[in-house]
A protein has these predicted regions:
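Alpha-helical recognition segments enriched in aromatics with Gly/Pro capping
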Residues: 1-2, 107-109, 166-329
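Residue patterns forming the tRNA-binding/recognition surfaces of aminoacyl-tRNA synthetases
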Residues: 1-176, 187-191, 259-260, 291, ...
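A glycine-rich phosphate-binding loop feature that marks nucleotide/adenosyl-phosphate handling sites
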Residues: 2, 39-49, 113-121, 282-285, ...
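Acidic/polar loop patches that form or flank catalytic/metal-binding clefts of enzymes
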Residues: 33-36, 211-212, 272-279, 315, ...
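Conserved phosphate/anionic-ligand binding catalytic regions in large, soluble enzymes, centered on
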Residues: 46-48, 53-54, 101, 107-108, ...
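Short alpha-helical scaffolding segments that buttress acidic/His motifs in well-ordered protein cores
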Residues: 98, 219, 223, 263-264, ...
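A short secondary-structure junction motif
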Residues: 222, 226-230, 288, 321-325, ...
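Acidic, turn-prone loop/beta-hairpin segments
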Residues: 362-391, 422-509
Length: 509
């Protein structure tokens, strides 16, 4: 409760902060007060109620980091960071100055630290259930199973009583409910309330060993994710070894001292290698006024309202094009999402709508997905520009540079709508269905179909609609979804840099 105990009798029962003046006077009377004054500094407060926290010195378990640092730095040097300055900057410097890691917590819920201690000074770190059973007496094993059975029965009764009342309310399928009812939990329950009652036999003196009361820091568990998800090394060793290190992870800038760090510590300690090969680090999203987002203050737009009002695609593209993907803070604004919709989504949809409108009027159907061998310079130019765009986007995506992709896409949409379609409109409008008109349709069809695949990772919903409609007339060669297609490969033979330069000069003139 934040009150002094009998260890300091003069202030027993007083709130820690209320005794400051009395403590100061006691030190002064003893002639040991060197200086008294006030300093301004940051002080930790409870993130829920803003109450000042109290520092308390306690004994804890630490993981020694110093012997691992050199290997951690070498492993970090092999990781591709986006943005790259984090590797040797914030993350690398963090490793260099990292203290020993306090891996224990004094709370009830959590993974029990599997260390048993004996009064003779001997300690055992238990590495598996099998080892735990070996060190336990038979009575303790049976006691654990009995406690587990009682717990499961109690939980099962509560779940059935409460869930039964609400199945209808949430329209939960009865078959699913029966399936859950039949599911049981392994009898080897090692939650704290059970494992704390498991005393081991000391192999040194034969006396009783008791588990240390602390639980693991949850960040230790986060760093264990690659191994825990496969129950490695006890199961699925081949699956783990095939997928470790991970090819790619992504998280916020704060994780340079969190998940990225704990993954690196444990991978270096266990295997002497990096835990991941590529990492994209995003910045922190702030309120429009630059303040931290707060549920209590409600200083942000409801995400559901943003999705319903502006769409998931617009929000997704806005975030991909924001400073957030460069590990910089983003002041979120609905205006920014709206502007992205006007700059990209609407022009792209209008280009698709233009094609569909006139293709339906002329009953035009595609012979296939490929671009025609048109001699028209506009057709050759837009196909060249498309392949150049595919090449540039693919190159940046290969290097995880998401923030460099959207400007390329915006530029292509601008060229497609404000130059190609605008300068080709009369080819679609004319009444006769000659070769030039057919080439215009086939070219625009190919461009829209290919570009929908390029845009699919960025506008997943809009591109799915466009792709499915455009391929509905194709008898063969199309996927059921744009997201099942391979990313387009640039056709270098269709890229004409000289023609692109001439067209750019024409536009500027």
């Amino acid at each position: 409760e934040g009150r002094f105990t009998g260890a300091v009798a003069p202030w027993q029962g007083k709130l820690v902060f209320d005794a400051d003046e009395e403590i100061t006077q006691t030190i002064k009377k003893a002639g040991r007060l060197v200086h008294r004054g006030k300093i301004e500094h940051r002080y930790p407060h409870c993130y829920r109620c803003d109450t000042p926290l109290i520092y308390k010195t306690i004994e804890t378990w630490f993981m020694k980091i110093e012997p691992l640092k050199q290997n951690m730095l070498e492993n970090n040097g092999r990781i591709h960071w986006v943005p790259d300055h984090l590797r040797d900057g914030r993350f690398g410097k963090g490793i260099e100055s990292a203290p020993d890691w306090n891996v224990s917590r004094n709370r009830y819920w959590g993974t029990p630290i599997p260390i048993w201690q004996c009064e003779c000074g001997h300690s055992e770190c238990v590495g598996s259930l099998k080892q735990l059973h070996t060190l336990m007496g038979a009575g303790d094993r049976e006691k654990g199973k009995q406690r587990h059975a009682e717990t499961v029965a109690k939980v099962s009764r509560s779940v059935k009583e409460e869930a039964g009342k609400r199945l209808g309310e949430f329209k939960v399928d009865a078959a699913w409910a029966r399936k859950i009812e039949a599911t049981d939990i392994d009898e080897n329950d090692i939650h704290r309330h059970i494992v704390d009652e498991c005393d081991l036999i000391c192999p040194v003196c034969g006396q009783t060993m008791v588990r240390t009361p602390e639980v693991l820091d949850c960040w230790f568990e986060s760093g264990s994710m690659p191994y825990a998800q496969n129950h490695y090394p006890f199961e699925r060793a081949e699956a783990f070894e095939r997928n470790f290190p991970a090819d790619f992870i992504a998280e916020g800038l704060d994780q340079t001292r969190g998940w990225f760090y704990t993954l690196t510590v444990l991978a270096s300690a266990l295997f002497g290698k990096e835990a991941f090969r590529n990492v994209v680090v995003n910045g922190i999203i702030l309120a429009e006024d630059g303040k931290k987002l707060s549920k209590r203050l409600r200083n942000y737009a409801d995400p559901v309202d943003v999705l319903n009002g502006l769409g998931a695609d617009a929000l997704r593209l806005f975030l991909i094009n924001s400073p957030a993907v460069k590990a910089e803070d983003l002041r979120f604004s609905e205006r920014g999402v709206s502007e992205m919709s006007r700059a990209v989504l609407l022009p792209f949809w209008n280009a698709y709508s233009f094609f569909v409108t006139y293709a339906n009027v002329d009953n035009w159907t595609p012979a296939g997905p490929h671009a025609p061998a048109s001699e028209n310079e506009l057709d050759r130019w837009v196909v060249s520009l498309l392949n150049d765009t595919i090449r540039r986007v693919n190159d940046q995506m290969e290097h995880y540079n998401l923030y460099r992709v959207v400007p390329v896409l915006v530029s292509f949409i601008d060229n497609l709508t404000n130059w190609y379609i605008r300068r080709s409109r009369r080819r679609f409008w004319k009444s006769e269905n000659d070769a030039d008109k057919t080439n215009a349709y086939a070219t625009l069809y190919h461009v829209l179909l290919s570009f929908s695949k390029v845009m699919a990772p960025f506008l997943p919903f809009m591109t799915e609609t466009i792709y499915r409609n455009l391929t509905s007339a194709l008898k063969t060669g199309s996927c059921t979804s744009v997201h099942l297609c391979s990313f387009p490969a640039a056709d270098g033979g269709r890229i004409d840099e000289e023609l692109e330069e001439k067209m750019d000069l024409t536009r500027r003139a």
